[in-house]
Amino acid sequence: MASRASIAVTRLSRVAFAGLAVLIITAGCHRAPKSTASTELEVEGREIFRYDTFGNEQFWTDSAGLVELVDKRIEPPEALRLGLKVDMEKLDLAKFVGNNPFSTGGTKELLKRDAVVGLKATFSEDGGLQKVGITCALCHSTVDDALLPGIGHRLDGWPNRDLEVGKILSMLPIFTPEQKKILESWPKGTYDPRFNFDGKSTPLVLPPAYGLAGVANETYTAEGPISYWNAYVAITQMHGRGTFKDPRIGVNIVQTPDMVTPKLPALRAYQHSLPAPKSSYDDSEAARGKVVFDANCARCHVGGNLTDNNNGVLHAPSATGMDPAYAERTPQKKYRTTPLRGLAKHPPYFHDGSAKTLEDVINHYAKVLNLQLTEKQRKDLEEYLKSL
């Protein structure tokens, strides 16, 4: 089935760009979400989150061939089909109307304006694309589609569940044919943060980076606090220049100068400033659902952040009916109770996306934990989960 972005691009190619002016005017009525960054440290962290590559051009340009891929193969229609997002606030909307942004060379023009969310490029004096790196926002920001599907205002902290990470990686020349087949099999909005170490493939749903304040460990398997995971990803996955050591998993990377560690406090401050988005729900049903939740779910979902992991608790996969394959690749071999924040805004659920809806989540636990819930109780519980 074609994506909303690809359908929009096809339609757009059939209309005169003068007609796009109507969309521009309409989009102008949609205000950009107000930034949550208020302190100097949070503002610094926002810039890091959005635009800092941590020097990873050393890998993506010098080794992986991302420049050639972007320069020769990925034009805007393909970029949107692959789930890349465009920040409309970086566009000159008058020129956007007057010039076809989906023409040959359009991707470079978007990169020159820092408009492709999560990609950072540098250009030569004659306009040639020299280097490309990636930022945190590539996977952990999306847009509100205010202009077109895939083009709108930034939503930092929202996971990009449209991003075809595996397909993009499979287009790079550094992988073997066997590896490319594995990468191409990853569902959109997923990524395996250990594939480059052990070659196994259990892709995880990209998690939200909002609502993290007060959460002790921000990974499905609770390896460490948010700055631990930020460092792990920045250095071992994004291939930034820095130092990361964890003897539990046999990683000892030392690169100087360290372009990651000094930035971790500001990055954490910005992520902690990102609130979980609110959803609509039925007040009466949610109130009844809270009673159901307290009686059946609050054994693990405890405290203000609704996770017993803040008390150091982890759960064997068999205890909650989770697929053990990913946990077995981690030091703890267990899963954390996921904090419940903005749930309705980031389906699918569980580490592997195996629950497509909140109803699926409830039915899963009702079966695994033998919860004797009526259909009405399940519906009320779903409304309560939407309220979190």
Task: State each model region's role.
Residues 11-14, 30-32:
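N-terminal Sec-pathway targeting helices
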Residues 29-46, 51-137, 141-149, 153-265, ...:
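Electron-transfer interface patches adjacent to heme c in soluble/periplasmic c-type cytochromes
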Residues 1-11:
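N-terminal secretory signal peptides that target proteins for export/translocation
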Residues 15-26:
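Bacterial N-terminal signal peptides
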